[in-house]
């Protein structure tokens, strides 16, 4: 099966395959986090082995074990043959294909999967069906790391240790809630470690280590950790099952702890009070070319509280008195908010309009303009370079009483 990026052209072969290579310090951290003692580990499987960093770290901790490395890139395969011990089995092929694992009995499965989108294939559909993992798909596409999680699951059984590196959607997006619940229930000693966004050379990604041992299904607490760029653990906390199925990122719960909000608190949300959230109809540049004024993220500094709008054009989305505007995108401006007190006007696609029933407006405004509202938006923003908020995420925002 060939891998494909979605929506853009790749810069090089590693980019086309969605590869980011694991630094030695992070490989060691992942292996050291596995709740599997060194005695009795006979076989390790490395899915999409790349340059072999994970296997090298695993062989240091489990020196009496053998390893099977599966890698699709012929250049990396040649390098692996040149650097790995002779008793290591290196398979040139796609880890997502079926058949190569026949006869293997893995004690540990490790992987740093590709982060791009992959087209669904017969083999992917087969192991998604066999594992019965609730992995979301988007039409004929699936996240690469999600596909590799399912593949690792198929290669494992009760007692097998799993060590995976995944991107942030699997850890915190609502669409992956059911998958998180399955992992939490069936991985004993589950630990999720948030990595520094600059840990991978030449890429800025928010990635996480997921480590645990497959076990009988039960509700469990989860250990969350934060690692520095060199793989040193700098902080940790434990959360309960109910919070964990919602999300598993350390920064979020640390922010909630810092501002004194319980992770298990379930107050009203923007959704429960009937909030409507829409983005602007055009970009800032588009409106400028049309000769139309539109409220943009750069305007929040000047109008931090109350807005008097003008320049209404009903061909596009319009903000009216009572509406609240917040930035949709922009790492530096996500803390801002403004409410319309007079007039009507346009707003750009970088801005969300929140329309709230009158009885709940003050509650929503009080929440958004509080320190909790700022911390919550920062903790829930997605993306790496340009942080952004989604409608689905915002609708789940809890409200201060």
Which stretches of residues belong to each language-model region?
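Class I S-adenosyl-L-methionine
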Residues: 1-83, 94, 172, 179, ...
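Conserved proline-anchored active-site loop of SAM-dependent methyltransferases
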Residues: 30-33, 44-58, 93-97, 103-126, ...
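Conserved Class I SAM-dependent methyltransferase catalytic core
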Residues: 74-76, 138-195
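S-adenosyl-L-methionine
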Residues: 82-100
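Generic structural signal for buried aliphatic residues
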Residues: 162, 324-325
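Conserved "cap/hinge" positions at secondary-structure junctions
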Residues: 166, 329-330
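C-terminal substrate-recognition regions of SAM-dependent nucleic acid methyltransferases
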Residues: 198-321, 332, 342-346, 359-401
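Short, compositionally biased
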Residues: 337-351
């Amino acid at each position: 099966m060939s891998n494909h990026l979605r929506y853009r052209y790749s810069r090089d072969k590693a980019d086309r395959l969605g590869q980011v290579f694991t630094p030695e310090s992070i490989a060691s951290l992942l292996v050291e986090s596995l709740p599997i003692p060194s005695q009795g580990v006979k076989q390790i499987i490395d899915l999409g082995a790349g340059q072999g960093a994970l296997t090298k770290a695993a062989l240091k901790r489990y020196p009496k074990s053998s390893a099977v490395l599966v890698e699709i890139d012929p250049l990396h395969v040649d390098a692996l043959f040149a650097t790995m011990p002779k008793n290591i089995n290196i398979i040139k092929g796609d880890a997502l294909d079926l058949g190569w694992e026949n006869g293997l009995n893995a004690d540990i499965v490790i992987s740093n999967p590709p982060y791009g989108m992959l087209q669904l294939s017969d083999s992917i559909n087969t192991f998604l069906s066999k594992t019965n993992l609730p992995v979301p798909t988007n039409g004929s596409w699936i996240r690469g790391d999600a596909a590799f999680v399912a593949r690792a699951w198929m290669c494992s059984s009760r007692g097998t240790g799993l060590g995976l590196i995944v991107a942030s959607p699997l850890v915190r997006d609502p669409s992956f809630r059911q998958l998180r619940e399955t992992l939490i229930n069936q991985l004993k000693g589950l630990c999720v470690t948030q990595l520094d966004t600059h840990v991978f050379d030449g890429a800025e990604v928010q990635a996480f280590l997921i480590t645990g041992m497959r076990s009988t299904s039960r509700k469990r607490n989860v250990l969350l950790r934060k690692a520095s760029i060199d793989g040193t653990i700098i902080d940790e906390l434990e959360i309960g099952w109910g919070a964990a199925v919602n999300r598993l990122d350390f920064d979020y719960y640390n922010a909630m702890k810092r501002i004194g909000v319980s992770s298990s608190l379930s107050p009203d949300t923007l959704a429960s009070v009937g909030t409507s959230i829409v983005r602007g109809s055009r970009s800032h540049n588009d409106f400028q070319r049309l000769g139309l004024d539109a409220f943009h993220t750069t305007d929040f500094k000047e109008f931090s509280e109350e807005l008097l709008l003008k320049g209404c054009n009903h061909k596009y989305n319009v903000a009216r008195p009572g509406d609240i505007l917040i930035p949709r995108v922009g790492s530096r401006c996500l803390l801002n908010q403004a409410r319309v007190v007079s007039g009507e006007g346009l707003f750009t696609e970088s801005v969300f309009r929140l329309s709230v029933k009158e009885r709940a407006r003050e509650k929503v405004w009080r929440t958004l303009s509080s320190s909790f509202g700022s911390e919550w938006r920062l903790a829930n923003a997605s993306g790496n370079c340009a942080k952004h908020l989604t409608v689905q995420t915002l609708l789940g925002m809890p409200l201060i009483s």
